[in-house]
Design a protein with these regions (language model features):
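Short glycine- and acidic-residue-rich catalytic loops of nucleotidyl-transferase/cyclase enzymes
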Residues: 41
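Catalytic core of pol beta-like nucleotidyltransferases
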Residues: 1-26, 32-38, 47-96
Length: 96
């Protein structure tokens, strides 16, 4: 996994602030491959609380860009009925 512990902590802190303490955040995509360089940060948000929608995602991306630097960050929800969300849950890594 190509995220530093501080980056993981920042992602989790922002996610908990926006989505609540029970949120689960999965990293998926190219950042899981240690042999690659660069790439965006692909996150899947899983929460039991009411779905927050696109505005919550925009807030989270804005806060992460401010705290982590200007990186490409993509966020999807686990409720999305898409192949990408299904693959992210299947192959992604839960951030702790």
């Amino acid at each position: 996994m190509r995220l530093q512990k501080q980056e993981i902590n920042t992602i989790l802190q922002v996610a908990r602030h926006i989505y609540g303490e029970k949120v689960k955040v999965y990293l998926f995509g190219s950042r899981l491959d240690n042999t690659k360089r660069g790439g965006d940060i692909d996150l899947l948000i899983r929460t039991e609380e009411e779905k927050k929608g696109v505005l919550a995602r925009i807030r989270m991306i804005a806060q992460l860009k401010f705290l982590l630097g200007d990186q490409k960050i993509d966020i999807i929800g686990d409720h999305e009925d898409s192949i990408v969300a299904q693959e992210a849950l299947r192959k992604g890594v839960l951030l702790v």
